[in-house]
Amino acid sequence: MAAQINPSILSADFARLADEAKAVEGADWLHVDVMDNHFVPNLTLGVPVVESLARATDTPLDCHLMIEAPDRWAPQYVEAGAGSVTFHAEAAAAPVRLAREIRAKGARASMALKPATPVEPYEDLLPELDMLLIMTVEPGFGGQAFLDIMLPKIRRTRELIKKHGLELWLQVDGGVSAATIERCADAGADVFVAGSAVYGASDPAEAVRALRTQADAATAEASWSCDH
């Protein structure tokens, strides 16, 4: 699969969200961080903004719910127009049931793991998902430095995906930039959330293209992709 670049609107100008969404319409998805000031120490946006964004852009929305009680709230984001909804393993009461509900409503189901959360306990759950998100920073704020210590976790996750023959996307989020994306791709990631690396650039659309080119080149050389 070609690398997917998902610009994060957490790094966009919130007063110009519709314009900021249009500025990256060559992107694969638009990553929307939803924070409730409980699961993470920050407050961002909710269902009404997702509804507005869905009307304002043709780019599908990839909603990352950094919230408590995602079992209750996640289905509302599908109804609001999200094409993919990510809940946190650490917050979900019944992750399999929730993933199935998200899928039944017509969106891709994704689960996120904080840096300290290992992937191995969730191995049997992976077939229920369309994507797994490995956080490469502590969730809650944009602009943080990439955690290199997450690279072995990305590799282990890719190995599990191959072991079970899954068509599971592997997303990374946090500190992804021109300086780090190749390492992520080499480790096994194929979906990349980029915030300030895109919206901090003078030409966000060109930044998306450049990141995708970098990731594709690294993937082509990666050992995990050789038998694809």
Curated annotation (Swiss-Prot):
Annotated a divalent metal cation binding sites: 31, 33, 64, 173
Molecular function, one GO term: D-ribulose-phosphate 3-epimerase activity
BP GO annotations: carbohydrate metabolic process; pentose catabolic process; pentose-phosphate shunt, non-oxidative branch
UniProt EC number: 5.1.3.1
Reported cofactor(s): a divalent metal cation
First-tier enzyme category under EC: isomerase
Stated name of the protein: Ribulose-phosphate 3-epimerase
Source species of the chain: Streptomyces coelicolor (strain ATCC BAA-471 / A3(2) / M145)
Lineage, uppermost ranks: Bacteria, Bacillati, Actinomycetota, Actinomycetes, Kitasatosporales
Name of the coding gene: rpe
